[in-house]
Amino acid sequence: VHLTPDEKNAVCALWGKVNVEEVGGEALGRLLVVYPWTQRFFDSFGDLSSPSAVMGNPKVKAHGKKVLSAFSDGLQHLDNLCGTFAKLSELHCDKLHVNPENFRLLGNVLVCVLAHHFGKDFTPEVQAAYEKVVAGVATALAHKYH
């Protein structure tokens, strides 16, 4: 993903303030609530019957943290997202059969959650940089599908 030096600085500065566990759990939870068809990949997570059940589910929170930890690793390798996410792409494509559109949806939800958590600090410029990053990550995760 191509970011200007200012965009890279903005992404990294904000990411340094992100609580990966909290934001990850909220982002994955919102994905499962807003796009309920994505729940089919999480049958083993137990009760996902209502928004409050999803948002309070410890397995959702734990997996959200895992997802955002991987995203965090990707931020260290913005020039090689396909390489960074190659194994996860293969897993989600070949074994889990996740629709690659779901990566884009999760990226959009993550941007919303970051905006909610950071308010005025999540300026339009910061949002634009994050939009580039989540699009790049979604493309990298979908790489094995092509």
Swiss-Prot record:
A cellular component term, taken from the record's GO annotations: hemoglobin complex
GN (gene name): HBB
Keyword check for Hydrolase: no
Keyword field contains Nucleotide-binding: no
Family: Belongs to the globin family.
Binding site for heme b: H63, H92
Modification S-nitrosocysteine occurs at: C93
Tissue-wise expression: Red blood cells.
Functional summary from the UniProt entry: Involved in oxygen transport from the lung to the various peripheral tissues.
Sequence positions bearing Phosphoserine: S44
GO molecular function, one term: metal ion binding
CDD domains: Hb-beta-like
PANTHER family: HEMOGLOBIN FAMILY MEMBER (PTHR11442), HEMOGLOBIN SUBUNIT BETA (PTHR11442:SF42)
Stretches assigned to the Globin domain: 2-146
Residues modified to N6-acetyllysine: K59, K144
Organism: Otolemur crassicaudatus
One record GO biological process: hydrogen peroxide catabolic process
Subunit structure and binding partners: Heterotetramer of two alpha chains and two beta chains.
Keyword set, alphabetical order: Acetylation, Heme, Iron, Metal-binding, Oxygen transport, Phosphoprotein, S-nitrosylation, Transport
List of residues that carry N-acetylvaline: V1
Name of the protein: Hemoglobin subunit beta-1/2
